[in-house]
């Protein structure tokens, strides 16, 4: 009886202590700031359990305790802080703290965990065979990046058919000049995908990823001379029709679940190691318009398919060899890279494949080739979307790409939900049978992760940022993926993304607002680690001001790339190196006597990543107008390159290390004139990257595209239309009277931003002048120059720059005072006292006075500049009127008579950018006038167009010379500390 009373007393005491502890912890958490992120809501106490028999205390957190990034420091601090609350009588009990369904130490991502990794959260097997696609012409190796890794991303929603409304609609509203369907792409396509590819990854997107509306499709089943030619040639075994159905583009549009894959045939032949048994196929496309095109091929996969099928892409810059592992990815479009092609059919426009291989007797399959993206061709409700394929939802690309209807029409009555499921299901279908999805049939592509990038709703009436949100789903089935991997590894990826953004984006005041483990189809259905990342709120003006900033996009996507890199490498327990930032201070110095140019640059340090220092560089060369070569590696921060007279050479530089390569530098050009009377220095001062003009008052907010659409990095396809509603009175509404409501007139339109390639355009005019050589440099390199007297003239490019450097202007003024000839052109210069006060008139006025006058005149010749948003050039909405000063001469006038360009002494000043002139012959004539004093319309410098080099009807086995088909090519903008030593490399043309 005494023992019973004593036991009851002890139970009572411990129960009281347990209740007391629960009360202490609950009260403590109400004011406790979780370590690591101030944006996450406070944690709550879900439950507290004291188990006397096991002598354990289990504290289960809720709210913020489920939603933060856990690392060793955070876990240690939480344990330490809660341990202090435990009464002395329970000190000997083992404490476990639960967050998001697991002990919080289990939630530490492997990439930041000390000690041994959790076996259930890392891959048991690794893919070590040939990647799906490998660029064999790449002159460098990536040893500690993502080479051999396969990543799938999707850039949000897209245009889809709403059966209830009976029409094609966006999945999200038109707000602040965009929709989520368009806007999310503007992060993923120009920034994140190139970063991952620069690290060596093979990147796949269920949704079309290229902003180009043209498309050329060539196939062995359909012969259409308007598209180009298809030729198959054999010296040994003949190409034979495969028993597997192939691609044939037999229809202009496809209804229901029709797909061109399965409508045609494919060809096959055994691989060989001997050239005398070679079999070739050539596709010679008829390119509708000169420019960059993505190149895709399709084929069939077999158990005995060759792992090293070589495709040679003949393009404007030379020939690039790409190896495809045909054991995977059969029956769909496979991306081989993006290349520059000239309009029409020529010997620089060809894709060729052979059956040459390291191993003989394996199967080589060929079918179709596709260049470009094209317009949507899937019918729903009796109509197509009328949009480019890149603007449509992923499910329609899946249908065009040969995925089964179970992937893109899983809910036939609901196109919206079917689209959501189609994205992760595409990864399962293509990845099935690989080491990462081994227990499902599929196409064997070893995808390791799937990530969906979106923007979110939510707004602030006080101009606060809503910010990003990282989402995963761990509750499906038994909590494991197809491979047996714990689904909590998706939380690791979401957690790293959360932590990376919170760390890297502090300068913008941006912090993740939470990490959610919730039931979303897009993060649930994948059989590899999958997350959704909401980058910002498209409904909140403060977020959108950041979101339109190209530098912000670059920095945010670099944070994403680094988190992906760390995550994938941690899953295989290997080290990593972060790719460098772009180089700075780029310049090209011309040495005519030795017919060489000296290229020099400096590396850019990354204060956030110690491993991101470059160890070497790759220099890319372009001859003439189109197409860079495959690049050459240089060890130092400079090199000499031999050039030939009478040809414009252009150069880009990328920084390299074991983690990959950086974004490219700006493009600089040089030229040796056979009759040079003085060398011109072109200085690129147009470095502006900026979002559109905006206003934010007590009653109104929004973006003003007509005032200034901003300058994006290269192509941009994110606008839906101009904002219509600016009043703040109806924030949060998605209706036509809601704050930010916008039009639809820009949907599907591609708009050109800053290409950083303007010295070539100016240089083409100098070449036409006939008696001047030229070279070029960045503005930052120009500021370091000391010997400007060797140049006959300086051509200063300002584009639509808004910020001007006083040091640059001082050097230009000194150059003029010493007798130098100066040409300055730009669309915003007269708004700057720095420029206006030195070279213009203080009475100069802005372009608002131009009214409806849009044309310009030089020597009675009418011409136009790019005033409006377009796909050829950045726009110049506000060119300057330049008021003449005493002794100055008007060279160019606007249509209303206002002066657009003047010359006084050795200085020519234009209130619009030279490169914005639409007519190339007028532009070249004006440049010649500025240099030599007389205006005339010279011929346009253009590429030669030649006939196709191979016609099957004129080729027989005996006359084919295989050697003629080999490679005959001649052997930033977004960030930036000089390296003390300099080494030179001599590169001959």
Question: Where do the PLM segments sit?
Answer:
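Beta-strand-rich modules
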Residues: 640-660
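A short beta-strand element within beta-rich, extracytoplasmic domains
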Residues: 279-303
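Non-catalytic propeptide/linker segments at domain boundaries
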Residues: 60-61, 65-169, 359-361, 366-387, ...
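Pro/Thr/Ser/Gly-rich low-complexity, intrinsically disordered linker/stalk tracts
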Residues: 567-611, 660-678
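Active-site-adjacent mobile loop/cap segments within catalytic or ligand-binding domains
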Residues: 266, 350, 354-357, 368-376, ...
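Extracellular carbohydrate recognition and processing domains
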Residues: 316-346
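A glycine-rich, often tryptophan-bearing local segment used as a flexible ligand/cofactor-contacting loop or short
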Residues: 796, 800-889, 895, 926
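Aromatic-Pro/Gly-enriched surface loop or interdomain linker
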Residues: 191-199, 207, 381, 667-792, ...
């Amino acid at each position: 009886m005494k023992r019973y009373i004593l036991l009851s007393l002890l139970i009572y005491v411990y129960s009281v202590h347990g209740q007391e502890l629960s009360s202490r912890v609950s009260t403590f958490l109400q004011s406790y700031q979780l370590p690591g992120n101030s944006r996450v809501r406070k944690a709550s106490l879900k439950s507290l359990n004291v188990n006397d028999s096991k002598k354990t205390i289990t504290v289960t957190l809720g709210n913020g305790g489920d939603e933060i990034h856990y690392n060793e420091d955070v876990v240690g601090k939480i344990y330490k802080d809660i341990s202090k609350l435990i009464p002395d009588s329970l000190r000997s009990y083992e404490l476990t703290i639960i967050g998001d369904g697991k002990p919080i130490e289990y939630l530490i991502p492997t990439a930041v965990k000390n000690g041994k990794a959790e076996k259930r959260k890392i891959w048991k097997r690794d893919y070590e065979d040939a990647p799906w696609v490998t660029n064999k012409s790449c002159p460098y190796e990536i040893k500690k990046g993502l080479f051999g890794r396969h990543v799938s991303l999707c850039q949000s929603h897209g245009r889809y058919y709403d059966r209830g409304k009976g029409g094609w609609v966006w999945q999200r509203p038109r707000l602040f000049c965009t929709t989520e369907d368009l806007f999310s792409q503007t992060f993923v396509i120009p920034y994140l995908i190139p970063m991952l590819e620069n690290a060596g990854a093979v990147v796949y997107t269920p949704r079309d990823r290229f902003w180009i509306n043209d498309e050329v499709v060539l196939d062995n089943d359909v012969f259409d001379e308007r598209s180009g030619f298809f030729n198959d040639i054999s010296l040994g075994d003949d190409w034979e029709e495969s028993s597997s159905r192939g691609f044939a583009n037999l229809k202009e549009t496809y209804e229901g679940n029709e797909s061109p894959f399965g409508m045609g045939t494919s060809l096959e032949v055994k691989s060989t190691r001997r050239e005398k048994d070679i079999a070739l196929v050539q596709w010679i496309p008829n390119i509708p318009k000169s420019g960059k095109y993505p190149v895709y091929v399709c084929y069939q996969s077999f158990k005995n398919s060759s792992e090293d099928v070589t495709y040679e892409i003949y393009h404007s810059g030379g020939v690039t060899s790409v190896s495809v592992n045909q054991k995977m990815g059969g029956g769909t479009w496979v991306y081989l890279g993006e290349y520059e092609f000239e309009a029409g059919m020529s010997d620089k426009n060809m894709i060729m494949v052979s059956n040459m291989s390291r191993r003989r007797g394996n199967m080589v399959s060929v079918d179709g080739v596709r260049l470009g993206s094209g317009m949507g061709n899937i019918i729903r409700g009796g109509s197509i979307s009328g949009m480019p394929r890149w603007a449509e939802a992923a499910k329609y690309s899946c249908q065009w790409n040969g995925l089964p209807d179970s992937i893109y029409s899983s809910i036939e009555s609901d196109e919206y939900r079917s689209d959501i499921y189609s994205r992760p299901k595409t990864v399962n279908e293509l990845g099935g049978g690989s080491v990462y999805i081994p227990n499902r049939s599929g196409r064997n592509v070893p995808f390791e992760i799937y990530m969906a990038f979106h923007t979110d709703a939510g707004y602030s009436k006080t101009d606060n940022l809503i910010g990003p949100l990282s989402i995963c789903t761990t509750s499906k089935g038994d909590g494991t993926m197809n491979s047996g991997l714990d689904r909590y590894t998706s939380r690791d990826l979401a957690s790293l993304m959360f932590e990376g953004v919170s760390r890297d984006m502090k300068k913008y005041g941006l912090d993740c607002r939470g990490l959610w483990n919730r039931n979303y189809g897009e993060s649930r259905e994948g059989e590899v680690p999958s997350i959704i990342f909401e980058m910002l709120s498209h409904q909140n003006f403060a977020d959108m001001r950041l979101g339109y900033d190209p530098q912000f996009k670059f920095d945010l996507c670099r944070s994403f790339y680094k988190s992906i890199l760390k995550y994938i490498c941690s899953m295989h327990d290997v080290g990593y190196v972060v790719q460098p930032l772009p180089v700075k201070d780029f310049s090209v110095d011309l040495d005519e006597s030795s017919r060489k140019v000296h290229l020099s640059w400096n590396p850019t340090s990354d204060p956030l990543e110690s491993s991101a220092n470059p160890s070497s560089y790759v220099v890319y060369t372009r001859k003439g107008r189109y197409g860079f070569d495959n690049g050459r590696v240089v060890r130092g921060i400079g090199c000499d390159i031999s050039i030939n007279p009478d040809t414009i050479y252009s150069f880009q530089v990328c920084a390299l290390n074991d983690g990959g390569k950086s974004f490219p530098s700006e493009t600089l050009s040089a030229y040796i004139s056979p009759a040079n009377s003085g060398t011109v220095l072109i200085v690129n001062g147009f470095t502006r990257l900026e979002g559109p003009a905006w206003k934010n008052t007590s009653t109104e907010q929004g973006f003003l595209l007509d005032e200034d659409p901003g300058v994006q990095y290269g192509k941009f396809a994110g606008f839906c239309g101009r904002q219509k509603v600016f009043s703040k009175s109806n924030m949060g509404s998605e209706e036509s009277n809601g704050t930010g409501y916008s039009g639809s007139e820009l949907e599907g339109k591609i708009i050109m931003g800053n290409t950083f390639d303007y010295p070539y355009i100016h240089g083409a005019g100098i070449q036409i002048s006939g008696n001047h050589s030229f070279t070029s440099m960045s503005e930052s390199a120009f500021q370091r120059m000391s010997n400007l007297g060797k140049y006959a003239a300086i051509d200063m490019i300002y584009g639509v720059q808004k910020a001007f450097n006083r040091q640059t202007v001082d050097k230009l003024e000194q150059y003029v005072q010493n007798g130098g000839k100066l040409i300055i052109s730009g669309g915003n210069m007269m708004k700057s006292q720095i420029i206006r006060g030195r070279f213009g008139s203080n009475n100069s006025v802005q372009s608002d006075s131009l009214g409806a006058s849009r044309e310009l005149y030089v020597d009675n010749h009418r011409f136009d500049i790019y005033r409006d948003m377009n796909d050829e050039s950045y726009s110049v909405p506000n060119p300057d009127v330049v008021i003449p000063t005493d002794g100055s001469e008007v060279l160019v006038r606007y249509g209303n008579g206002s002066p657009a360009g003047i010359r006084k002494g050795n200085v020519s000043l234009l209130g619009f950018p030279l490169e914005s002139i639409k007519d190339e012959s007028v532009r070249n004539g004006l440049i010649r006038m500025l240099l030599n004093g007389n205006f005339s319309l010279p011929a346009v410098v253009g590429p030669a167009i030649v006939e196709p080099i191979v016609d099957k009807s004129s080729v027989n086995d005996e006359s084919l010379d295989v050697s003629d088909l080999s490679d005959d090519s001649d052997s930033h903008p977004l960030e930036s500390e000089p390296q003390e030593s300099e080494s030179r490399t001599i590169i001959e043309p």
